[in-house]
Amino acid sequence: KIESMITFKKQSQDLPYLKFRKEYDRALYADQKIIEAISVSSFCKSNSIVDSRFVNLKIVDDTDFIFFSNYESPKSKQFMSHNQVCVTIFWNTTNVQIRMRADIEKTTKEFNNKYFSSRSPKKNALAISSNQSNRIDSYQSVEKRFKEAERTEDLNKCPKYWGGFVFRPYTFWSISDHLKGYL
């Protein structure tokens, strides 16, 4: 059995979302590596530049696409200052590219708490101890913070600075060998 890296909840019956699921399943069964990796591009108002980074898409629920991050990270600050993003996915095993333009916002505190408590203690210790995108002194200091979090923190309690982002595409474009164009 092949394990899905993205949790699909309620499935929208609109064509773009059905197409996304079909292409995801094709890539999954073609053994796509790091299938959950998506590139999210955003605009930074403070210095007027566009920035991109890879994140792991975790949940697709109806028309909502959800990933998680440290709310104090530069990317999170960009999302909050300019709530539009462009998301790109490329699955090379099936030669499919998907691009979505979307509005983005934080998920609710209740949603974050529920999701966080469902994760493994090690993942939560990492989220608690990580100062995403900040300069580190050494690998040893990161490891020390992680071990300290494992030992001293409530690993089921979601920190205030951690949570999800949900984006809802308003433009959904897919290109592959067998289908090209806007959906």
Positions of PLM-derived features:
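Charged, gly/pro-rich active-site loop segments
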Residues: 2-11, 97-183
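A short mixed-secondary-structure module that forms the rim of ligand-binding clefts
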Residues: 58-95
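Short acidic, glycine-rich loop/turn motifs
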Residues: 42-47, 89-93, 176
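Generic beta-strand structural signal
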Residues: 36-38, 63, 83-87, 94-102, ...
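Coil-to-beta-strand transition motifs
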Residues: 50, 62-64, 95-97, 179-180
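An N-terminal domain-cap segment
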Residues: 8-62, 66
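Short His-Asn-centered micro-motif
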Residues: 41, 68-70, 168
